[in-house]
C-alpha cells in the first residue's frame, strides 16, 4: 500500500525512475546513480541490468567508480515488467549515458541528489521547521502538514505520504518482497 502511495505521489516527477530502480531492482543509491544505459538490456528475451558502477561524490562532484562495495555487488538483476516499461519510457526521452542524470546528462552531484529526493520529502506529512525574522529577531515556526492538503507555497504539491522514505528503504522493500516470494535475495 505504501509503495502504491509513493509511486502515485511521484509519477512523472524526476525521482520516479530512481524509486522504481530501488523498489524493483533493489539497487543501492550509489548503484542507481552510477547506472548507465550500456548496462541496461531492455530488448533481450529476459530483460536485465548489470550492476558494474557506483556513484559517490568528492567535494560535491560526482565520481563514478567501477569498484563496488562488495564482490557480490557485481551482479545481473532481472527486470520485472513494471520496471521494464518504466525504463523503456525513460530511455525514449533520455539524452544521457546515465539512467538518472542532471539536465546536462551528467551524473548527479550530491546537492542535485538531495534536491531530487526533496520531491518525495515535500510530499510527506513530516513536521517541518523554518525560521523568519520578525522585528529583527529570528523566530522558529513549525508546520505540520495535513494528509491530503495542498502545500501553501505550491499548489502542485499535495501532502500524500503519511510515512517517511529513505533511499535505503527502497532496497529493503525489494529484499523483503523477494523473501515473501520465497526467492533467495543472494
Can you describe what each PLM-predicted range is?
Residues 1-35, 45, 72-73:
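Basic, Lys/Arg- and aromatic-enriched nucleic-acid-binding interface segment
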Residues 3, 20-24, 33, 40, ...:
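Generic alpha-helical hydrophobic packing signal
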Residues 3, 37, 80, 84, ...:
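ATP/adenylate-binding site constellation spanning eukaryotic-like Ser/Thr protein kinases
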Residues 4-15, 25, 77, 92-99, ...:
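Short, basic (Lys/Arg/His-rich) helix/loop patches that form interaction surfaces
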Residues 9-11, 30, 43-82, 90-93, ...:
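Basic, Lys/Arg-rich DNA-contacting stretches centered on the C-terminal catalytic core
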Residues 16-19, 33, 43-44, 51, ...:
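Extended hydrophobic-aromatic, low-complexity segments
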Residues 26, 37, 54, 170:
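An acidic- and aromatic-residue-enriched active-site/binding cleft used to recognize and process polar
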Residues 39-48, 164, 183-186:
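Short, polar N-cap/turn motifs at the start of nucleic acid-interacting alpha helices
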Amino acid at each position: 500500500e505504501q509503495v502504491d502511495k509513493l509511486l502515485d505521489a511521484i509519477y512523472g516527477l524526476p525521482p520516479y525512475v530512481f524509486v522504481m530502480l530501488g523498489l524493483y531492482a533493489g539497487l543501492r543509491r550509489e548503484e542507481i546513480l552510477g547506472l548507465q544505459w550500456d548496462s541496461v538490456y531492455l530488448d533481450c528475451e529476459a530483460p536485465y541490468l548489470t550492476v558494474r558502477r557506483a556513484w559517490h561524490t568528492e567535494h560535491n562532484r560526482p565520481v563514478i567508480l567501477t569498484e563496488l562495495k562488495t564482490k557480490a555487488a557485481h551482479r545481473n538483476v532481472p527486470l520485472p515488467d513494471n520496471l521494464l516499461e518504466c525504463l523503456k519510457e525513460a530511455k525514449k526521452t533520455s539524452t544521457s549515458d546515465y539512467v538518472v542524470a542532471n539536465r546536462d546528462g551528467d551524473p548527479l552531484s550530491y546537492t542535485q541528489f538531495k534536491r531530487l529526493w526533496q520531491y518525495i520529502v515535500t510530499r510527506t506529512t513530516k513536521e517541518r521547521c523554518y525560521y523568519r525574522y520578525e522585528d529583527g529577531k529570528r523566530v522558529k515556526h513549525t508546520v505540520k502538514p495535513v494528509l491530503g492538503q495542498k502545500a501553501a507555497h505550491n499548489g502542485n504539491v499535495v501532502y500524500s505520504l503519511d510515512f517517511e522514505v529513505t533511499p535505503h528503504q527502497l532496497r529493503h522493500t525489494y529484499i523483503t518482497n523477494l523473501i515473501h516470494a520465497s526467492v533467495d535475495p543472494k
